UniProtKB/Swiss-Prot annotation:
Pathway(s) of this molecule: Amino-acid biosynthesis; L-arginine biosynthesis; L-arginine from L-ornithine and carbamoyl phosphate: step 3/3
Lineage summary: Bacteria, Pseudomonadati, Pseudomonadota, Betaproteobacteria, Burkholderiales
Subcellular location: Cytoplasm
Full protein name: Argininosuccinate lyase
InterPro entries: Arg_succ_lyase_C (IPR029419), Argininosuccinate_lyase (IPR009049), Fumarase/histidase_N (IPR024083), Fumarate_lyase_CS (IPR020557), Fumarate_lyase_fam (IPR000362), Fumarate_lyase_N (IPR022761), L-Aspartase-like (IPR008948)
Length: 471
């Protein structure tokens, strides 16, 4: 690393009597992670230069030289030939130094009316806005993949669980639509967070604004911001937008993690509801029979990492006085890693979902266990005039009897159901039509209302979700 330390004075070194040590340079430099902001730094600088020229703060010839130099720097960065220097601390001074080497005094004039404080805040917002747009697109792709799978399984019955115990039958498409709802809310949260990201800090300078006659609204328009940050102190020190994004990202990963947990369970041979395509799984170095769902497992693990970044950013900001502090340099790595993790995870899951093989027979067999239609029997009795609590008790008696007989409610005859219900002279409420409500199909079909698991409602929900996807 020492060989990378150029023997040039820092941009601010005229104030000091001795140079920084190599160790301190390495400790305080950020260029090797914030260089990913480079193209956005160029974008912001070009808009700033255009404003300076428009306002007569720099000459048009200087603006043209800056634009020409930045075009060359962009080419070098995209080609991977740009020489990043640790001695120049960060992405901003590296680009400025290269620009000055090419454009001379014009390059030195670029920083007129701005500080690295408002410059970096602008770069991060430009970058994060772009990444949010990418994430929103990936969320829509995942929602679309889930809808495609749900559409294939509007009649496939699977047990619904509470406490991981069989509760009531649902159609598998309905189960998948629950995740569509989660990822729809995630999309909305991302778009809402984008509103706070899309404000321009540039013009706040170090903390108090600038004495030059700048036009902040012009720069905001050039860069596609909705408006400007209204307080210069807040503009350079605010990282709420990054925290808010990380909170939204943590919820994305939480929903991915919940889905992953179910995929792992469903793929287990003891459950056997699904299979995941080989390209998303790994084997064992010792057990030749293994096919491990590593992608869902890793997604569960990476969720903790993203959650940790959120807590890290909250902790980073909680003790900072106004305005900018060097602490804020530590916002970038957790933010960058959060974006990378969410983007990679969503991209993989959108690719993985279409290849899921659903084992409908296994799902149905599981739904036939655990007395999944017990609630339907209770509802049947209520509809015939029995108070719900009495109906609940009667069905509980029947379930206990089935435990002893090792059979399901649907296996009992009408006579047996009457005898074991404990209803006494009200046992005749159990009629010859009772078995219709004890079937899986009858159970799911009866939930025929908005948000219910009836196949008809699930198909309508898919249509509505697709309309929301297109909107």
């Amino acid at each position: 690393m020492t060989s990378q330390l150029a023997k040039k004075a820092e941009a601010w070194s005229a104030r000091f009597n001795e140079p920084m040590s190599d160790l301190v340079k390495r400790y305080t430099a950020s260029v090797f992670f914030d260089k990913r902001l480079a193209l956005f730094d160029i974008q912001g600088s070009l808009a700033h230069a255009a404003m300076l020229a428009k306002q007569g703060i720099i000459a048009e010839a200087d603006r043209a030289a800056i634009e020409q130099g930045m075009a060359q720097i962009r080419q070098e960065i995209e080609a991977g030939t740009f020489e990043w220097k640790l001695d120049l601390e960060d992405v901003h001074l590296n680009i400025e130094a290269r620009l000055t080497a090419m454009a001379g005094d014009a390059g030195k004039r670029l920083h007129t009316g701005r500080s690295r404080n408002d410059q970096v805040a602008t770069d991060i917002r430009l970058w994060l806005r772009s990444e949010i747009d990418n994430i929103v697109g990936l969320l829509r792709a995942l929602r679309g993949a889930l809808l495609d799978l749900a559409e294939q399984h509007t009649n496939t019955i699977v047990p619904g669980f509470t406490h991981l115990q069989v509760a009531q039958p649902v159609v598998f498409g309905h189960h998948l639509l629950a995740y569509v709802e989660m990822f729809t809310r995630d999309t909305e949260r991302m778009l809402d967070a984008r509103k706070r990201v899309n404000r321009l800090p540039l013009g706040a300078a170090a903390l108090a604004g600038t004495s030059y006659p700048i036009d902040r609204e012009f720069v905001a328009q050039q860069l596609g911001f909705d408006g400007v940050c209204r307080n210069s102190l807040d503009a350079v020190s605010d990282r709420d937008f990054a925290i808010e994004f990380c909170a939204a990202a943590a919820l994305v990963m939480t929903h991915i993690s919940r889905f992953s947990e179910e995929l792992v369970l469903w793929m287990s041979p003891r459950v056997g509801f699904i299979d995941i395509a080989d390209r998303f799984c790994t084997g064992s170095s010792i057990m030749p029979q293994k096919k491990n769902p590593d992608v869902p497992e890793l997604a569960r693990g990476k969720t903790g990492r993203v959650n940790g970044h959120l807590i890290g950013l909250l902790t980073l900001m909680k003790g900072q006085p106004l305005a900018y502090n060097k602490d804020n340099q530590e916002d970038k790595e957790p933010l960058f890693d959060t974006v990378d993790t969410v983007v990679d995870t969503l991209r993989i899951f959108a690719d993985m979902v279409p290849g899921i093989t659903v084992k409908a027979d296994a799902m149905r067999a599981a739904a036939l266990q655990g007395y999944a239609t017990a609630t339907d029997l209770a509802d049947y009795l209520v509809k015939r005039g029995l108070p719900f609590r009495d109906a609940h008790e009667a069905v509980a008696h029947a379930v206990r009897a089935c435990d002893d007989l090792r059979c399901d409610l649907a296996d009992l005859s009408v006579t047996q159901l009457r005898e074991i219900s404990g209803l006494g002279d009200k046992a005749n409420l159990i009629g010859d039509d009772v078995h219709a409500v004890l079937t899986l199909e009858g159970s799911v079909a009866s939930r025929n209302h908005i948000g219910g698991t009836a196949p008809e409602q699930v198909r309508l929900a898919i249509v509505a979700a697709r309309a929301g996807l297109a909107g």
